[in-house]
């Protein structure tokens, strides 16, 4: 079995002490004439004049893992042999003269290097073929191999520090470059932690530098492309973030603006509600407080006996003969003066007549027909001098005390028309002829006529009251009634118009009136208490327009003027309607009683 050594090295006979060769090697004298002596550990004696061996990591381009020769005993590290051979070939000798013993050792080392060169060529061919296959895995495994190399370097350095067989430094041990196979054949034991040395010189170093420069240029171009793309991406992200921030700010400003509008509307509505509720509560509290105060004062005050009204006016002097008995006793029988005549008691008769009227109003009796028989009429006229037939003389001849005084009551006051109230409307209507006195039934009729006309003239009123003999007094009284009707009507309109403004109604078109409205019910109760007739539909429109006119006037601040209602009066005056003809019927007042 061939040992793999050159023929010259194979024919050499070992000496007794190991590897001394007595014969020289003339063929290699040309190349190694100035070969420096080698120490026992493979290093030159002058370490300052030698080249420092540069340690490189195994290139991944070769496609082989690091230290492959350690797995097989027959393989020899190509990089180690090549590096050792090239290093020794190009090394500069430190001295021109060496001893023969040292020259013999140099020749032995030269043979070893020659065998390593041949073995290197074979391995390089194999590595070149394997490198073609490994180029495809270069990009994916670059980072992994670098990590593995760093780890192996650390392990190797730690092993070198911990190995007891190491007699020299790590750098000198790397220079031993003795292959494992040659050491085994020659009987030389190397440590288990033999390291692979990569020394690149000459053309190999230049090729590697060229490859590194190409890779550096490619890497620089790739980094530039990646950097430019990264800048563009950063710019795109910056602009996107800026636009997103602007959109958020605009949306936040819009939300704030809408919230401000909503808050202002809420504040205005809350303010209006608070003012309205406060006024209502204040009125209620004041009204309750006033009622309580009145009740307390009445409870604390002593009971008072009602005093009868004075029989004479306060400025009239008292009559000393008022309570005295008549100077003569009543005489039975007739005469010029009836027996019940009392000249000093005329006011008692007047008071009795007034009490009779009050009693009749309290009884609220219905109107009944009075039937007078002929016999009764004849009997009443049979004895004209009888006491029952002749009326009291005080009715025809009033006493001096019955004459009206300053500030007192006149006799004509009893015959005037009643007031605006129809409280005496249940007394009945005494029809059957014309009269100059206005009754409560006439007042009720006038209120119903107000549904159609608010400003009637005197001629129109006379045509709808045919049973009244009009004179100056009752005509003025009838006109006064309608004036009072209008006053109540406009007061209600002003009240509800201010209430609508307090509720926040600012547009007149938002005001609507129907027969179910509170305002219309108040008016109908006042003018048509017993619902004798159905309220006309036209009245709803008139009430609505009146309320709107008051609303606009108060809203514009015209109510501060003294005569601000005159404009409204002119508008309402144009809304007059025709009064129905059934108001002229003679029995219309009788229907009002039912």
Swiss-Prot record:
Superkingdom assignment: Eukaryota
Keywords, alphabetical: Developmental protein, DNA-binding, Homeobox, Nucleus, Transcription, Transcription regulation
Domain Prospero-type homeo: from-to ranges: 435-493
Residue ranges with Basic and acidic residues bias: 118-135, 369-378
Subcellular location field: Nucleus
MF (Gene Ontology): DNA-binding transcription factor activity, RNA polymerase II-specific; RNA polymerase II cis-regulatory region sequence-specific DNA binding
InterPro entries: Homeo_prospero_dom, Homeo_prospero_dom_sf, Homeodomain-like_sf, Prospero_homeodomain
Domain Prospero: 494-593
Record's compositionally biased regions (Low complexity): 73-101, 379-389
Stretch list, region Disordered: 1-20, 30-180, 358-389
Composition bias, Polar residues: 1-13, 36-50, 105-117
Disruption phenotype: Lethality at larval stage, L1. Surviving animals do not develop into fertile adults. Animals have abnormal sensory function with their bodies harboring lesions and signs of progressive degradation. Defective excretory canal formation with down-regulation of genes, including exc-5, ifb-1, gck-3 and aqp-8, involved in this process. Seventy percent of L1 larvae do not form excretory canals, but have a large vacuole around the excretory cell body. The remaining larvae form impaired excretory canals that rarely extend beyond the pharyngeal-intestinal valve and do not extend to the somatic gonad.
Comp. bias (Acidic residues): 136-162
Protein family (similarity comment): Belongs to the Prospero homeodomain family.
Purpose of the protein: Transcription factor involved in developmental processes. Controls the transcription of genes required for excretory canal formation.
Name of the protein described by the UniProt record: Homeobox protein prospero homolog 1
Organism, scientific name: Caenorhabditis elegans
